[in-house]
Amino acid sequence: MKHVFSTSLIVSLFVIFTDAQTFQYSRGWTNGKRSSPEQTAPSRTLLPHIPLGMDKPDEECRLLIQRFLKSPCDVRLANAIVNRNKDLLRDMADDVNDGTALLYDPVPMVDTAASEDVRFKRGTPDRRLLNDGMHRL
């Protein structure tokens, strides 16, 4: 009788935890709060902690920084913020609007080759094939 009670207790707790987790993730609840339909950008979290070098940045500069912080891997953005150069920030905005800005430097990736194990494990294409396709363009 003891085994039946303990087994039924374990199974019922498992069902309760599974249903609670399914309800939590299927309804959009995270950490006890309802997730907002609006996507939370990282810039809202990071913007107050960035030293801008200006007591009150103008609205255009603030909006540009928020826009660029959505893709924080751009090294030029970090340099612009560190150097507090508003002109460089506006030039970057022009580059993004023109479609000429890169979020990363492709040169280090050209000469590196992924090992066979990693390449086949992740299903990534061979870099040599990608480079050949880029040279044809």
UniProtKB/Swiss-Prot annotation:
Q: Name one GO cellular component term.
A: extracellular region
Q: Which residues carry this modification: Asparagine amide?
A: 31
Q: Which GO molecular function annotations are given, in alphabetical order? A: corazonin receptor binding; neuropeptide hormone activity
Q: Which UniProt keywords apply?
A: Amidation, Cleavage on pair of basic residues, Neuropeptide, Pyrrolidone carboxylic acid, Secreted, Signal
Q: Which residues carry this modification: Pyrrolidone carboxylic acid?
A: 21
Q: Which Pfam families match?
A: Corazonin
Q: Where is the signal peptide?
A: 1-20
Q: Which GO terms describe its biological process?
A: neuropeptide signaling pathway; positive regulation of heart contraction
Q: What does this protein do?
A: Cardioactive peptide. Corazonin is probably involved in the physiological regulation of the heart beat.
Which family, according to UniProt? Belongs to the corazonin family.
**What is the protein name stated in its UniProt record?**
Pro-corazonin
Q: What gene codes for this chain?
A: Crz
